[in-house]
Swiss-Prot record:
Pfam families: Trypsin. Residues 25-260 form the Peptidase S1 domain. The gene is Klk1b24. This is Kallikrein 1-related peptidase b24. Residues 1-17 form the signal peptide. One of its GO terms (biological process) is proteolysis. Keywords: Disulfide bond, Glycoprotein, Hydrolase, Protease, Serine protease, Signal, Zymogen.
């Protein structure tokens, strides 16, 4: 059985990807080859579920809402530009253990009731079973050391849906430029809480956004990793409804401590 699962994961042929719960590029463009070498494709068994970010050869950061359950077998692909094609640059690694943030409310994963919710602390660390090889196509990115600046131009990337109203996944990794906005711009359009551990980013005129399947992927502002995709509007890219990203400067200590305690 495990051989079959591995074969399916390695071949990437006919993967029936489905958007994860509340997963969140619309209006973007094909990323330049190997321009996002820290971008990771996260799978549960042979199903693509989320994006991720390589922090060092042993650790990947993604969103907590990408969590399945305690017995889920995660694996990742690094160094990929095309999700459904074999590439010489690609590396496959199994995940030995997952670490969702302890303060993320896991009951949200099974709660579809339309009422105000707090989706704070939406991040999860994945410990790789063996280190990634650092190459031109696979490189880690550092955590932020200072607050992001409002108005910054940010780059989000992912293999999420490229259409706002239906699940249409691309083969090529997509990039989109969006603006870092005051959190107040995200409080009005949403029922859910927007807290100080979140970032608000997008285009107030709409049309550019992360979307279903982009969750856990990086938000890089002024060349610095400042967030990972968390949640946003339905449909994606709505005017006056920017998306929400986990604010990583608020979690740098937890990330570093977790990695240090689990070498």
């Amino acid at each position: 059985m495990w051989f079959l699962i591995l074969f399916l994961a390695l071949s990437l042929g006919g993967i029936d990807a489905a958007p994860p719960v509340q997963s969140r590029v619309v209006g973007g463009f094909k990323c330049e080859k190997n321009s996002q070498p820290w971008h990771v494709a996260v799978f549960r068994y042979n199903k693509y579920i989320c994006g991720g970010v390589l922090l060092n050869p042993n650790w990947v950061l993604t969103a907590a809402h990408c969590y399945g359950n305690a017995t889920s077998q995660y694996n990742v692909w690094l160094g990929k530009n095309k999700l459904f094609q074999r590439e010489p640059s690609a590396q496959h690694r199994w995940v030995s253990k997952s670490f969702p943030h302890p303060d993320y409310n896991m009951s949200l994963l099974n709660d579809d009731i339309p009422q105000p919710k707090d989706k704070s602390n939406d991040l999860m660390l994945l410990r790789l079973s063996e280190p990634a090889d650092i190459t031109d196509a696979v490189k880690p990115i550092d955590l932020p050391t200072e607050e992001p600046k409002l108005g910054s131009t940010c780059l989000a990337s992912g293999w999420g849906s490229i259409t706002p109203t239906k699940w249409q996944k691309p083969n090529d990794l997509q990039c989109v430029f969006i603006k870092l906005l005051p959190n107040e711009n995200c409080t009005k359009p949403y029922l859910h809480k927007v807290t100080d551990v979140m970032l608000c980013a997008g285009e107030m005129g709409g049309g550019k956004d992360t979307c279903a399947g982009d969750s856990g992927g990086p938000l890089i502002c002024d060349g610095i990793l400042h967030g990972i995709t968390s949640w946003g509007p339905v449909p994606c890219g709505k005017p006056n409804a920017p998306a929400i990203y986990t604010k990583l400067i608020k979690f740098a200590s937890w990330i570093k401590d977790t990695m240090a305690k689990n070498p």
